């Protein structure tokens, strides 16, 4: 009998979203006629926009011809998509990113989880609290976190509390972290950061030889001027930061699967003997070993997101979701809830009513309003007493959900 990776036994019982699904299933079985409105997990509801559909249809037709058939593609991504990403997502900001620094993948969740494989297992990890669970759980699996304590924190992680008192901006740790996870616009709090704050993080990383893992999956939802869209807007960030982007929420690709990661050539890691190693080369080796690339049809769809018509259609979808966010924010505020986020991100972070715990509030909304959200404590101990609602629902469902919640 083979021995197992015992680090998996250190994971908290049940990943957050399966636990939500389990509770909803139990309720549904007992109340089969109940209309449950789901504002929890961040899946999109609008269809793929016409420009993208048309591009994928044409690509599919190509695949049915001798001259247009594509088998295994380049693992890093087709050049036509890499160029579009470099030109539109970075060139438009005055940032020079080379095609060889971009790696197309099947999702930011995968990238955020897999990137830790190229770092030493004794690396010291710093995460915000609350935090997207994937950052923590994948490091638990790798054996970096130590044991979980009674307070829900792992002994070897550096936790950076993001609270109402500090504007949900995690403070730079006093100790040295080898790897720092940052996410802006933030999941779960829906808040954003400033360029000055990012400058301070870059300075910290340079001083401590740290690597920043910057999750910018929700960049397209930024609406206010002056909010940074990329950490590479900060001078010197290419020497210390890896950035993650996704088409999932931007263009509704949750069922298609396409994202990318940027690893600048300037970015280096070190061996135990002190030798510098290119992280771009290291990730390229990992990526080409474990991944066969995103399909040609999907990448042609992703390329169409950057066409003038594609951009216009996608902005219409984003505006739809952000109108939902405004409805949620305004409705909850009028009902007396303390609400954060939802301006530059599709998530609304609210204080639970009557000082209920996050899971008690979840049960209250499910049982009394038939509305499903996400308990804040599932994102970390500092999320206790908070709750996340997603703006990705249908307009009429969002309106009905808020009416139900505010009538409690």
UniProtKB/Swiss-Prot annotation:
Involved in the synthesis of meso-diaminopimelate (m-DAP or DL-DAP), required for both lysine and peptidoglycan biosynthesis. Catalyzes the direct conversion of tetrahydrodipicolinate to LL-diaminopimelate. Is also able to catalyze the reverse reaction in vitro, i.e. the transamination of LL-diaminopimelate with 2-oxoglutarate to produce tetrahydrodipicolinate and glutamate. Cannot use m-DAP, lysine or ornithine as the amino-group donor, when using 2-oxoglutarate as the amino-group acceptor. Substrate binds at residues 15, 42, 109, 132, 187, 292, 388. One of its GO terms (biological process) is lysine biosynthetic process via diaminopimelate, diaminopimelate-aminotransferase pathway. InterPro entries: Aminotransferase_I/II_large, DapL/ALD1, PyrdxlP-dep_Trfase, PyrdxlP-dep_Trfase_major, PyrdxlP-dep_Trfase_small. This is LL-diaminopimelate aminotransferase. The gene is dapL. It catalyses: (2S,6S)-2,6-diaminopimelate + 2-oxoglutarate = (S)-2,3,4,5-tetrahydrodipicolinate + L-glutamate + H2O + H(+). Belongs to the class-I pyridoxal-phosphate-dependent aminotransferase family. LL-diaminopimelate aminotransferase subfamily. Pathway: Amino-acid biosynthesis; L-lysine biosynthesis via DAP pathway; LL-2,6-diaminopimelate from (S)-tetrahydrodipicolinate (aminotransferase route): step 1/1. Keywords: Aminotransferase, Pyridoxal phosphate, Transferase. SUPFAM superfamilies: PLP-dependent transferases. Its EC number is 2.6.1.83. GO terms for molecular function: L,L-diaminopimelate aminotransferase activity; pyridoxal phosphate binding. It comes from Leptospira interrogans serogroup Icterohaemorrhagiae serovar copenhageni (strain Fiocruz L1-130). The modification N6-(pyridoxal phosphate)lysine is found at residue 249. Pyridoxal 5'-phosphate binds at residues 72, 108-109, 132, 187, 218, 246-248, 257, 292. It holds the Pfam family Aminotran_1_2. The keyword Ion transport does not apply. Its cofactor is pyridoxal 5'-phosphate. CDD domains: AAT_like. Homodimer.
